[in-house]
């Protein structure tokens, strides 16, 4: 299943401090890693949240980036003030030995394009730069496959589509939610307490017929999907509105709780039906 989620840019509005906002983003990122989310879409819900939007996108991308070239990609910014207290994701694109002698042929690594002594190369996190001429700009992230190993490394650039298993998530900023949903080619799951209760037999069967492309959409704490979309919700095709938290004991479900809960339910029943 190719799983994506959409979250409003106002998702951080209930947190007042940079540290708490950072921790909330981390919780969402970890849930996405655990349940193999391929893309996180941050959409605008009608409010102006420029600072939160920038923070959200920056930290999501930072956490997904392998540690060995985070400084190269992000430099220094106050937005990352509290990321040092966050647990690492340890998703597949971040797992790999730093010992060059242990690198295996055909191993896939994240890399960043660098320039050393006037020549381009790539840093793959092994303490040495591998010579590689790239058409990309310095600082650009790419994915490479190891063609030859220690001591004379060589690499080949590949696309994410060439990786057979889950690798990591990507982050995308987008416009209004209705536009995203109208252009989505696949099943759309709208999470709402006003929706039908989750039915494993019915809803997982829908996911299996989705051609592998599923978008799970979340509202914010103070504005649900129906409030954000209004009457336009009735014009959506190939969508389901589902309540994943029947008989909830709290007045509201926080966004990080909603992401974890909904994805765990989908994952549990999807896995059990394979």
Label each PLM-derived region with a short phrase.
Residues 1-274:
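Post-transcriptional modification and biogenesis factors for structured RNAs
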């Amino acid at each position: 299943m190719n799983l994506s989620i959409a979250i409003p840019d106002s998702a951080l509005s209930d947190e007042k401090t940079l540290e708490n906002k950072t921790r909330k983003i981390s919780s969402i990122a970890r849930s996405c890693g655990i349940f193999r989310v391929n893309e996180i879409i941050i959409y605008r819900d009608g409010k102006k949240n420029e600072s939160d939007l920038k923070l959200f996108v920056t930290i999501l991308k930072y956490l997904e980036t392998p540690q060995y070239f985070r400084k190269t990609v992000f430099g220094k910014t106050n937005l990352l003030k509290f990321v040092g207290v966050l647990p690492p994701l340890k998703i597949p694109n971040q797992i790999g030995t730093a010992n060059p002698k242990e690198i295996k042929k055909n191993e896939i690594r994240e890399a960043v394009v660098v320039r050393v002594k006037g020549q381009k190369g790539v840093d793959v996190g092994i303490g040495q730069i591998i010579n590689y001429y790239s058409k990309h700009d310095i600082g650009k992230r790419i994915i490479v496959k190891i063609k030859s190993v220690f001591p004379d490394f060589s690499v080949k650039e590949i696309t994410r589509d060439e990786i057979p298993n889950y690798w990591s998530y990507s982050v995308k900023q987008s416009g209004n939610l209705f536009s995203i949903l109208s252009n989505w080619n696949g099943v759309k799951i709208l999470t709402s307490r006003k929706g039908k209760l989750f039915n494993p037999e019915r809803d997982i069967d829908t996911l299996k017929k989705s051609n592998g492309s599923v978008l799970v959409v979340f509202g914010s704490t103070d504005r649900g999907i129906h409030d954000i979309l209004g009457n336009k919700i009735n014009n959506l095709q190939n969508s389901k509105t589902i309540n994943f938290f029947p008989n909830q004991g709290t007045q509201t479900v926080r966004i990080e709780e909603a992401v974890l809960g909904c994805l765990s339910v989908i994952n549990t029943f999807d896995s059990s039906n394979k």
